Amino acid sequence: LSEEPHPMISIVGALAFGSVIAGRRYRSVNANWTAMHYVLAAPSGVGKNYIKSGINRLLHASGLEDFFGANFYTHASAVYWALNSAPTHICVTDEFGDSFAEARKSENGNKMTVFKAMKQVYSDVDDMFRADAYSMSGLSKKDREEKKMPAVVIPSLTLLGLTTPGQFYNEIKANHIEGGMMNRYVVFNLGRDNVKTKRKMGNGIPSESMVSKVREVRHLDSAPRDYAFDARPNFIEVEFTEEVVAIFSRFKDE
């Protein structure tokens, strides 16, 4: 889609897309799922938003349009209901750094609950995500039953935050690191270098081969698109090869 694509932007988009289409479908022998939280920090004008268009179009073409979630969430309860409706989905959010700034403002407590909820969802990926409880004092038994919020089993929320470096890094405080929020993000920092000029532009329509590969990875011809939010999904267990284990070991040593 972009006239001057950045190779790393394409890689980040592919990682995020792979995270969502494999969500609740694949699990490693070490209980790792594919839902990841990515942040792409790059200056304006390098084509960050093309990721959003590409993921959206490919999910729609593959019949997985409900896997593409809202631009962001207004409150922790919105995170819960989004997963209740689509237990596997991706949130590609623009101006992620601005959302960080809004959450820090005392007058925007709702936005802070969103980040707390997403942090909890990340931790609960191999378990259940439960919404905050509200007082039911004075309600009848029938009303209490209707207001129950069942846990989301194996919540798969992939996050891709798009931001400029200044927006994001200027808002990071010590409590974000100490509280474990930053540990959950895989952050990519890009500059204006390595931009490639394309002589031939694509039409933005996903090819049949791409759609076919998505359906193959998701096993759409032999399995449901997804399982109910309150049901434990049947998954494919993935072994780690010796080469991968060696890479993990080197990473830990560093």
Features from the language model and the residues they span:
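Phosphate-handling catalytic cores of nucleic-acid transaction enzymes
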Residues: 1-254
